[in-house]
């Protein structure tokens, strides 16, 4: 039996419904005024935790176009990690890192009742603010600033007055990959989604806020903006079974820590260098996005490295912020992350169930939240080809910050199991209604659970992927497989041709093969002398757009030179160089550069015993 608590919000007369009004998103030509009524449905035995300000699930009822709609909301428990932190800098350059309380946050995902294709991303911090999709149309909702009133404005995205400006586009250009495999039509995507679910992946994200944005907004407004944007990006990636978790935010309060210029390419290159040599050493994460107010050349609104996810210098992106148009900024960020995950710009034959798709090279006047059939195809290819380790391992239950939500198929602290909703659950060990184990069951989820029993101690639950990885074994006490580990950095591998680095064995031969094919090998030592020149092609690193030559002892940590043995193309000193992706083709961190030495994140050849 359910108890239904109906909170009726007093109505106020608002005389300007339907006319033009200036709202947070800009000048809106047509809108409705609504008064959401909150409907809280709790099980009879449920008790709301007194210290919890924001409920885990909520429902609101209001009218759109004269028809009642019920908005179901569920707190986005993936939004923050357990160790979420914020870093700021004082005028003298000292960094201060804090860990604000984020468990009881007010950011939700949702859906509209009786609309199977609906979705929503909502902030409930002060009224309802965000967007929802209803009957194929994208609507925005926000509170009206009227004293003692619960009035909200609801309007279609298309009714925001457009700025008179040149078309905005993505700065990624090397997106001409085509496959011989047939691309599924949009109508086929729904039919096959249940059969071909994407493997669940987890991206731990850091947002870096440049000095222009820090000066533009106060601290609270900047935080709210970032949370709303990441909440929406998280929602956009749900159909691909990707979960984004915010690990931290870094604010460049006093000055930019790189040279942010109107050249998007140079800024991206500098940001990648900084992330690989600085941020990655301080903060564990998978990807970093620079949030900037710089107006880039060529109407560029974002740029990133294709296939760059999990790579020290390439798992980054640049996103231009668009004032209070958080939905637009979120779509740009999702687009750039899509490139990091192997997605190319949509080609002519690419379609989705919308007028445009996320990976369009030019941002539509009505930005879409949908990936095309081509993007789905590209992402599958990326997972198969690159097998990006950093995003394939789920966070441990203790690392999830938000309270558990029964029925979301994520086994969280406080739950004995979670197999989804009662309608979808196929697990005989778990009671879907309560997330409790069925009588006689020892476990219901986890890699160390089999036929409702915990596997015996010593049973392998995660096999070693290669010689630098280690297998994980069940403890006999828990159904959860221990955290993924690997051999210590610096352990010899590949017959002493390399040293282990973060679970991989990076050697130059494999990197040459990746760039130029199976016939490629490492070039003669004389080729690497080019890296001492600090030339257009040969250098060790870049600082504020200037190419720094390698010191003599570091030449094998700069640009990689290979011997291409393919027929008709025997170049003794071949290297990979693209103006728009200068990190690709550099020797990877952790690579052996001499006996007993490896390349560190600063592209220096250092003793393996002191490198880590």
From Swiss-Prot:
Disulfide bonds join 310-390, 350-374, 352-357, 461-481. A motif (D/ECD-tripeptide) lies at residues 467-469. Residues 21-193 form a propeptide. The keyword Cell cycle does not apply. It is found in: Secreted. It holds the Pfam family ADAM_CR. Belongs to the venom metalloproteinase (M12B) family. P-III subfamily. P-IIId sub-subfamily. Residues 1-20 form the signal peptide. GO terms for cellular component: extracellular region; plasma membrane. Its cofactor is Zn(2+). It catalyses: Specifically activates several components of the blood clotting system, including coagulation factor X, coagulation factor IX and protein C by cleavage of Arg-|-Xaa bonds. Has no action on insulin B chain. Its EC number is 3.4.24.58. Ca(2+) 2 binds at residues 405, 408, 412, 415, 418. This is Coagulation factor X-activating enzyme heavy chain. Ca(2+) 1 binds at residues 204, 286, 390, 393. Heterotrimer; disulfide-linked. The heterotrimer consists of 1 heavy chain and 2 light chains (lectins): LC1 and LC2 (AC Q7T045 and AC Q696W1). The active site is at residue 336. It comes from the Eukaryota. Expressed by the venom gland. One of its GO terms (biological process) is proteolysis. InterPro entries: ADAM_Cys-rich (IPR006586), Disintegrin_CS (IPR018358), Disintegrin_dom (IPR001762), Disintegrin_dom_sf (IPR036436), MetalloPept_cat_dom_sf (IPR024079), Peptidase_M12B (IPR001590), Peptidase_M12B_N (IPR002870), Reprolysin_adamalysin (IPR034027). Glycans are attached at residues 259, 353, 373. Binds 1 zinc ion per subunit. Optimum pH is 7.5-8.0.
